[in-house]
């Protein structure tokens, strides 16, 4: 999701990589939980949120061992099927975008602060409201901005705030 991408990128303030992206069934479930078209959609979304590299694991399904339960871009019989062609099409599209634009990082004028100390305090320490989940509250503010088409970064309280016109601080721990 865009929120997860922003949390990861916001902690680094630079482009990110997505290792071991999911293409189909996983070892945890045998259902085909990734519908056709979703890996392409996710890769385009990753690019829009500052991802520089995304890899799928496994590329080819295994014949044995725990990984034989996981779908790959290609199944263990090496026959190219729809997943392979979808990844191939996506790679071509992303290459064309990179050729025209170069590396892209989103430019946001709004930021939502995610403070790890506050996160720890509310999740592990004493709180006045046991149902209060700090990360859920951060998401609510982020989602409110995005639902109004306002691009927002999720950044640390230690980050440089000078480039932002709006800064949302969900909670502070003193």
Question: Locations of the language-model features?
Answer:
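Carbohydrate-binding surfaces of carbohydrate-active enzymes
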Residues: 1-174
């Amino acid at each position: 999701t865009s929120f997860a991408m922003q949390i990861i990128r916001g902690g680094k303030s630079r482009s990110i990589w997505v290792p071991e992206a999911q293409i189909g069934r996983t070892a945890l479930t045998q259902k085909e939980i990734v519908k056709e078209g979703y890996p392409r959609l996710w890769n385009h979304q990753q690019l829009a949120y500052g991802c520089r590299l995304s890899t799928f694991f496994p590329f080819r399904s295994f014949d044995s061992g725990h990984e034989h339960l996981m779908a790959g871009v290609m199944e263990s019989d090496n026959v190219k099927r729809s997943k392979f062609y979808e990844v191939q099409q996506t790679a071509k599209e992303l290459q064309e975008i990179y050729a025209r634009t170069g590396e892209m990082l989103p430019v946001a004028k709004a930021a939502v602060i995610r403070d790890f100390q506050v996160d720890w305090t509310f999740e592990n320490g004493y709180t006045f409201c046991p149902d209060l989940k700090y990360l859920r509250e951060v998401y609510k503010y982020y989602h409110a901005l995005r639902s109004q088409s306002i691009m927002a970064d999720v950044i640390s309280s230690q980050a440089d705030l000078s480039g932002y016109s709006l800064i949302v601080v969900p909670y502070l721990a003193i």
